[in-house]
Regions:
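Cytosolic-side transmembrane helix boundary signature
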Residues: 188, 192, 341-375
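Membrane-interface alpha helices of multi-pass inner-membrane proteins
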Residues: 156-172, 177-178, 183
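Transmembrane alpha-helix segments characteristic
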Residues: 114-117, 303-329, 379-380
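Membrane-interface micro-motifs in multi-pass membrane enzymes
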Residues: 58, 62, 86, 107-151, ...
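Perimembrane helix-loop-helix junctions
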Residues: 178-211
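Intrinsically disordered, polar/acidic, low-complexity terminal segments
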Residues: 2-55, 59, 69-92, 99-115, ...
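Hydrophobic, aromatic-rich transmembrane alpha-helices
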Residues: 267-309
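Membrane-interface transmembrane helices that cradle and orient dolichyl/undecaprenyl
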Residues: 143-157, 189-196
Length: 517
C-alpha cells in the first residue's frame, strides 16, 4: 500500500513546492503591478470586458477569453485576482514541465518556476495588458498540458488536441510553447536511446495534435463569429488573416523573414531588457554555449546511433524556428513581447542536458559547471524581477502625472460657457503634450510593447478617452468622436492646451484641443 501511495505523496509535495516557488517569485516580481490600478493603453480601454473588450476578443479569434473571465472572475479587470489566477496557471504549468522531463530536485523546481514567472512576456503583459494576463497564462497551461497528455501514451494526442483548441481560443501564440516542448521531449528521448522510427511516429502524432487542434479551433471560431454577429478583424496587426500574407510573399521575402526568425530568436534572448545588460548578456551566452557543448557531447557518445544523432541535430536546429514561429507566419509584422513566451524555455536546456554528463569521469574544475549554470539562471531571473518592478513603477508614475494634467483640463472644460457635464458632447482633439517623452532613468524601459510612451492613453481615439473619463476620472463627460469636424477651420484655429481658448463649443459640441490632430 505504501508503494502505491508514496508516488502520489511525492507528486503532491512537488506540486505544492512548485506553486510556492511560483508565488514567491511572482510576488517579488509582480506584486507591485497586482496591487496597483495603473490602467493604460489596452487595459484602460478594456477595463470592463462587458461589451467592447469581449467583442474585440471574439473579433481577433480569442473567443474563449470572455468565457474564461465569466468562469473565474467578473468582466472587470481586478488586478489582485487576475494576478493570483495568472500565477496559479504558471505554477501548474511549471509542475507539468517538471513532470514532463522528470525533474525532481528542489533546485530544478526553484529555477523552472523562476524563469516561467519572471520574464519579459509576463511583465509586459501584466504592466499594460493586465486584462488579458490570467487568460494568457491559462493559454500557457493549456499548451503545456497538451504536450503532457501527448507524452503520456499513444493516444494521448487526442486529449492534447482538446487542450490545444482551448489554448488557441485564449491566445494563439502559445502554440510556440507546445512546439518547443515537443522538440525538447523528442531530443531527450533520442538521447535516452529511443529509436529514430519511434520518435518520428511520436512526432507525427504531435503534428496531428497541433494540426487537428488548429482546424477544429478555426471551425469553432467561425461558428462563434456567425452566432455572435461580430465581424472578424481583417488586415490589421493582430488579425488572423496575417498568416495569409505568407502565401502572397515572394521567395525573396520568405527567405529574408526565415533568416530573421533565427537571428531575432537569439538576439532577443541574449539582448533581453535588463538593469545590467553586460552581465545578463554574458550569462545568457554562457548558458547557450554550455548547453550546446553538452548537447554535442551527448550526440557524440557511443550510445546514440547515427540516425539518432542526425535527427537530434535536425530537431535542435528547429527549436529557434518553432520558438519564434509567430515572427515567420506574420512575416515579421506582428510579433512582440506578449507572443514570445516560448523564448524563455531555452533555460530548460542546461537543466536537461548537464545532469546527463558523466561528471564522475570529468576533471574536477569542470564539475563546477552545474552549480555555476544554476547561479547564472538565478542571475537572469533576478534581473527580470527588477525589470518587472521598473515597468510597474513607470506605469504608476505616468498615471499620476497624467491625472494631474487631466484634472486641470477638466477644470478648463467646466469653465467653458455653455458646457453642461454629461449632456454636451465632448471631442478630445489630440493628446496632452505637457508630459515628458521619457522619465529620467527609464529610457531603456520604453522598448517593451505598451511601454514606449508616457501617455496613458497611447491612442487619442474616443474609445480610450471615454474609458479614461469613466474609469479614472469618474467624470460624466459625454465623449464622442470628432470625425470630419476635427478638420473644421474653426477647430484648427483653436490654440492647444494650456493656452487660453483651447476649449470651445462649436455647433453644440465642446472641442478640447490638446495638440494638433
Amino acid at each position: 500500500m505504501e508503494q502505491l501511495t508514496r508516488p502520489m505523496e511525492d507528486r503532491k509535495r512537488q506540486l505544492l513546492f512548485c506553486l510556492a516557488c511560483v508565488f514567491i517569485w511572482g510576488l517579488m516580481a509582480h506584486a507591485y503591478g497586482f496591487l496597483h490600478s495603473s490602467f493604460s493603453h489596452d487595459s484602460l480601454l478594456e477595463f470592463n470586458g462587458d461589451g467592447l473588450s469581449n467583442r474585440i476578443r471574439i473579433s481577433n479569434g480569442r473567443f474563449l477569453s470572455p468565457l474564461c473571465r465569466w468562469i473565474f472572475r467578473t468582466n472587470m479587470t481586478l488586478p489582485w485576482l487576475v494576478g493570483v489566477l495568472g500565477l496559479l496557471w504558471i505554477g501548474l504549468s511549471a509542475y507539468l514541465i517538471l513532470r514532463l522531463f522528470r525533474l525532481k530536485t528542489p533546485a530544478a523546481a526553484i529555477l523552472v518556476s523562476g524563469f516561467l514567472t519572471a520574464n519579459l512576456t509576463v511583465s509586459a503583459t501584466a504592466a499594460t495588458f493586465l486584462h488579458d494576463f490570467d487568460c494568457d497564462m491559462l493559454a500557457l497551461l493549456m499548451a503545456v498540458g497538451a504536450v503532457f497528455c501527448w507524452n503520456r501514451g499513444k493516444w494521448g494526442f487526442l486529449p492534447g488536441t482538446v487542450l490545444m483548441i482551448l489554448s488557441f481560443g485564449l491566445y494563439q501564440s502559445y502554440i510556440c510553447v507546445s512546439i518547443v516542448l515537443i522538440l525538447f521531449v523528442c531530443i531527450m528521448e533520442l538521447l535516452d536511446g529511443e529509436k529514430t522510427k519511434n520518435v518520428i511516429f511520436k512526432g507525427l502524432r504531435a503534428c496531428a495534435m497541433l494540426l487537428l487542434g488548429g482546424i477544429i479551433y478555426y471551425a469553432l471560431m467561425k461558428l462563434v463569429v456567425r452566432l455572435s454577429g461580430i465581424q472578424m478583424l481583417s488586415n490589421v496587426y493582430n488579425s488572423l488573416d496575417r498568416p495569409a500574407k505568407l502565401l502572397e510573399a515572394s521567395w525573396f521575402d520568405i527567405r529574408y523573414v526565415f533568416k530573421a526568425t533565427y537571428r531575432l530568436y537569439f538576439e532577443r534572448i541574449i539582448q533581453v531588457l535588463s538593469p545590467f545588460p553586460a552581465v545578463t548578456q554574458g550569462a545568457t551566452a554562457a548558458l547557450l554555449a554550455v548547453s550546446g557543448l553538452a548537447l554535442f557531447a551527448e550526440v557524440l557518445s557511443s550510445k546514440v546511433g547515427w540516425p539518432e544523432k542526425l535527427l537530434v541535430l535536425v530537431l535542435a536546429a528547429l527549436v529557434p524556428f518553432g520558438g519564434n514561429l509567430m515572427h515567420f507566419v506574420t512575416m515579421g509584422s506582428a510579433d512582440h513581447e506578449l507572443m514570445v513566451y516560448s523564448y524563455w524555455l531555452i533555460y530548460l536546456l542546461p537543466l536537461l542536458l548537464l545532469p546527463r554528463l558523466p561528471w564522475d569521469k570529468l576533471a574536477k574544475p569542470i564539475s563546477w559547471v552545474k552549480p555555476v549554470c544554476a547561479g547564472l539562471i538565478v542571475v537572469l531571473i533576478c534581473a527580470q524581477v527588477q525589470v518587472a518592478n521598473v515597468l510597474y513603477l513607470k506605469k504608476d508614475l505616468e498615471q499620476d502625472a497624467y491625472l494631474s494634467v487631466m484634472t486641470r483640463v477638466v477644470y478648463r472644460m467646466e469653465e467653458t460657457e455653455g458646457y453642461v457635464p454629461g449632456e454636451t458632447p465632448v471631442v478630445m482633439v489630440g493628446l496632452p503634450q505637457q508630459l515628458n517623452d521619457t522619465i529620467p532613468g527609464f529610457e531603456a524601459y520604453r522598448k517593451p510593447n505598451g511601454m514606449w510612451m508616457t501617455d496613458v492613453l497611447n491612442y487619442g481615439d474616443s474609445g480610450h478617452w471615454a474609458a479614461y473619463f469613466k474609469y479614472i476620472l469618474l467624470n460624466p463627460a459625454k465623449i464622442t468622436g470628432g470625425g470630419k469636424m476635427t478638420s473644421d477651420p474653426r477647430v484648427q484655429a483653436l490654440p492647444c492646451y494650456p493656452a487660453q481658448g483651447c476649449t470651445a463649443i462649436i455647433d453644440g459640441t465642446l472641442f478640447v484641443k490638446l495638440s494638433e490632430p
